[in-house]
Every structure is written in structure tokens, then in C-alpha cells.
Amino acid sequence: SMLLALRALAADEVDACVSSGNTGALIGLARHCCGTFEGVRTVAICAQLPNLNHPSYLLDVGANVDCTASQLHQFARMGCGLVSSLYPLDQTHGQKPTVRALSIGVESGKGNQAVTDAVALCADDASMDFAGLIEANQLLMDDCDVVVCDGFTGNIALKACEGTANYIRRYVQQALPENPRQSSG
């Protein structure tokens, strides 16, 4: 069960916990059994996105529909911690993970108040290389390590990426003959 797996994780008997159960239940049990990192009050769901050079990590993708600037900043710090634990520093952009905030434009001041205020918090945080805003059409093309957003926006962006990938796969499958030798003439 989820509870047993999370207790094993909290006791350092295992390195990770994977579940196909209810996400809300998993998050609640994880907070109860494992707690959170110091200074982190809000849980976020993180998704790995493919990228041209290395994966990016998008968070939140569904745990928090509305977020404050402080929560978005916490997500950025959690994402940086994840990237730093997975990859040696020389495999990221520099000595610190690169962070962007998902918004409706890349110009300064774009986005809602939480995003605008989070930009200031992240820009002042010496633990990360904050690279500004990013639009959804660049999620799979940009070299940033971490992208932060509220769970509503992140879930929509993730589902749009998944849907586009499924469309391309189906389109290619329909365009190719069932037997590739048939088209070789």
C-alpha cells in the first residue's frame, strides 16, 4: 500500500516510492510520513519534459490550482534541488540550475501578480540562475533546467505537450505504410 511504501521511504529503507494510486492521497500521506524540506510548506507535482539537450522539470503540474509568489519560489527551489541531485553541475548551464517562470509572454511584467512577484523572488535568490519568463511554445526547445508555474497552468501545458506528441505519433503512423518494404519499389 502507499502508506507502507512511504513509511519505508521515510525510514530510508528504499530510495523512492512510485504509486498508481490517488494523487491526493499520495501527497497527503507523503507529507505525513516524510514531511517537507526546510522552508517548504506546499507540495508540488513535477514532470520531466524532453528537451533538445537535457530534460527540463516543470512544476507544479496539478497539486495547487492557485499559487502565491512565495509558493512559486518554493517550487523553483525544489526543482533546483532535484536537478542538482540528478546531474553534476557541469551538465547544467553553469554552477546553478537555470530557472524560468511560465507566463503569457517573455517581456518583463507579463503574467498575473503571483508570477510577477515570483520573478522578483527568484531573481534575488542566489541559489539559482533565474533566466526570466518562458512561453509554453518554448517548453521543449529552451535549455532551462526548471520551469515553475501554478498547478492549473502546468497541468494544461503538460496535457497539451502529451496531446501534441500523440497527434504526431498517429500522423506518422498513418503516413507510413504498414510494411516499409512495400514502398521501396
At which residue positions do the language-model features occur?
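Short acidic, glycine/serine/threonine-rich loops at helix termini
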Residues: 28-33, 70-71, 111-115, 158-162
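Glycine-rich phosphate/nucleotide-binding loop
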Residues: 31-58, 142-147, 151-185
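Short glycine-rich anion-binding loops that position phosphate/pyrophosphate groups of nucleotides
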Residues: 22-25, 32, 106-107, 152-155
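N-terminal glycine-rich phosphate/adenylate-binding segment common to multiple enzyme folds
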Residues: 1-44
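Glycine-rich oxoanion-binding loops at beta->alpha junctions
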Residues: 1-13, 65-68, 133-141
